[in-house]
């Protein structure tokens, strides 16, 4: 908490923001009930800043139990309702609960074994999950997410990028480029 920061009414705040540490983009058309708003996430579970902290404090242990394996996920709200969203939390965080991809049924990190899908996963590798070419304006957003490192090597993802674009008033485009090390079934979730 920083008491020197003065409150600003939401109507006077920026309608979009790129949270670079966590690689999250948020955009809204306005503050009305029928506004269009969305978020897109593609970063390491504790943010990029955690990489240096893990190295600086060797006795510190990450616990990402509240983070989800949702790199590349997005939520869209328009005209007073969700157009897309996550399916909800079912006790064990799973990639399939989010708007992203699984490969032969395998999702991101080391999901499915408990509450912390990132336990034992190399944070240096997770730190490579990132947004690129983020462009935001009053009329839209375009970005590319490199999601390759969200998946363990055993999953067989050689490269996975997702292009996400929005052009006001309501055109969304999502384009995935995937290169696999072996033939497998790709499942795309849209909730």
Predicted regions span which residues?
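Extended polysaccharide-engagement surfaces of secreted carbohydrate-active enzymes
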Residues: 1-191
């Amino acid at each position: 908490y920083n008491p020197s920061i003065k409150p600003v009414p939401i109507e006077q705040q920026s309608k979009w923001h790129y949270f670079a540490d966590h690689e999250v983009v948020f955009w809204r058309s306005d503050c009305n009930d029928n506004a269009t708003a969305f978020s897109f996430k593609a970063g390491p579970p504790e943010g990029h800043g955690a990489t240096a902290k893990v190295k600086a404090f060797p006795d510190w242990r990450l616990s990402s139990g509240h983070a989800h394996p949702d790199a590349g996920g997005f939520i869209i709200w328009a005209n007073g309702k969700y157009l897309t969203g996550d399916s909800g939390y079912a006790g064990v965080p799973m990639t399939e609960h989010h708007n992203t991809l699984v490969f032969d049924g395998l999702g991101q990190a080391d999901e499915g074994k408990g509450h912390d899908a990132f336990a034992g996963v190399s944070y240096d590798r997770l730190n490579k999950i990132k947004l690129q070419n983020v462009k935001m304006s009053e009329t839209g957003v375009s970005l590319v997410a490199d999601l390759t490192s969200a998946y363990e090597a055993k999953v067989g993802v050689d490269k996975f990028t997702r292009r996400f674009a929005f052009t006001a008033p309501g055109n969304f485009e999502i384009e995935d480029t995937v290169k696999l090390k072996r033939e497998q079934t790709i499942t795309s979730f849209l909730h």
